[in-house]
Design a protein with these regions (language model features):
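Short, structured beta-strand-loop surface elements
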Residues: 32-80
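Short, solvent-exposed amphipathic alpha-helical segments in soluble enzyme
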Residues: 16-17, 42-44, 114-115
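Short acidic/glycine-rich loop or secondary-structure boundary segments that cap or lie
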Residues: 8-10, 35-36, 56-57, 106-107
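C-terminal edge-of-domain segments
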Residues: 59-120
């Protein structure tokens, strides 16, 4: 979920989300340009993950960075191909890097923070 600078919320499913490294996740944004513009003006993002068959779930509060080309873009696209979430790294779309700031339970209890007592 994202929010514009004016506070207008936006939410959508992302089927190409990957864990990129120990501090970040990433995905390919294929949606309308408005989704990318909203991330550029307000990079605060909440990602919900739930696996009902294992009765687990978390909220990830993240800060997004947009990559339309360059080495970070290519690294994310290559990882998506490696994980079979894309068939090829054809250079289309936008790579979104999400630095994880906080991990919470689905009930809002803080499990882990990048910076203690982070005001988010």
């Amino acid at each position: 979920a994202t929010s514009s600078i004016e506070g207008v919320p936006n939410a959508g499913f992302r089927g190409t989300m990957i864990v990129l490294d120990e501090e970040s996740m990433a995905y390919r944004e294929r949606g309308p340009l408005s989704a990318v513009l909203q991330l550029e003006e307000n990079p605060k993002v909440v990602v919900l993950y739930r696996n009902p068959s294992h009765d687990v779930g978390w909220k990830f509060r993240c800060t997004a960075a947009i990559h339309k080309d360059g080495p970070v873009f290519q690294r994310i696209m290559d990882q998506l191909v490696e994980h079979r979430l894309l068939t090829n790294s054809d250079g289309t779309g936008t790579a979104v890097l999400l630095r994880v700031d906080q991990i919470l339970t689905l009930y809002g209890e803080v499990v882990q923070e990048r910076v203690p007592n982070l005001s988010w």
